[in-house]
């Protein structure tokens, strides 16, 4: 364990923030497997907003379409290693 001086914290170095990614989800449908696969991990989980670059509203639409596709049997609930 190192010694930590009490008092003020060191200011963080200025970091360059990347601009948000643009995600096009126009016409996203639960039947379009190719477009839904972009938002699923290899294990079948829905990817986070910070990974996909989607806005809050877009992420809700993506999640709704994926969950609908799971219910309809277009994509499995789980994928990857099975027990």
From Swiss-Prot:
Family named by the database record: Belongs to the bacterial ribosomal protein bS18 family.
A Pfam family assignment: Ribosomal_S18
Gene name per UniProt: rpsR
Cellular component GO terms, alphabetical: cytosolic small ribosomal subunit
Function comment: Binds as a heterodimer with protein bS6 to the central domain of the 16S rRNA, where it helps stabilize the platform of the 30S subunit.
Keyword Ribosomal protein: yes
Descriptive protein name: Small ribosomal subunit protein bS18
Record GO biological process: translation
SUBUNIT field: Part of the 30S ribosomal subunit. Forms a tight heterodimer with protein bS6.
Annotated keywords: Ribonucleoprotein, Ribosomal protein, RNA-binding, rRNA-binding
InterPro entries reported for this sequence: Ribosomal_bS18, Ribosomal_bS18_CS, Ribosomal_bS18_sf
Gene Ontology molecular function: any one: structural constituent of ribosome
Domain of life of the organism encoding this protein: Bacteria
HAMAP family referenced in this protein's UniProt entry, alphabetically: Ribosomal_bS18
Xref: Gene3D superfamilies: Ribosomal protein S18
Organism, scientific name: Tropheryma whipplei (strain Twist) (Whipple's bacillus)
């Amino acid at each position: 364990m190192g010694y930590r001086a009490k008092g003020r914290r060191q200011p963080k170095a200025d970091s360059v923030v990347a601009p948000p990614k643009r995600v096009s989800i126009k016409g996203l449908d639960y039947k379009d497997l190719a477009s839904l696969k972009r938002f699923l991990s290899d294990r079948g989980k829905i990817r986070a907003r910070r990974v996909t670059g989607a806005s809050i509203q877009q992420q809700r639409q993506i999640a709704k379409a994926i969950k609908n596709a799971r219910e309809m049997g277009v994509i499995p609930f789980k994928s990857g290693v099975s027990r």
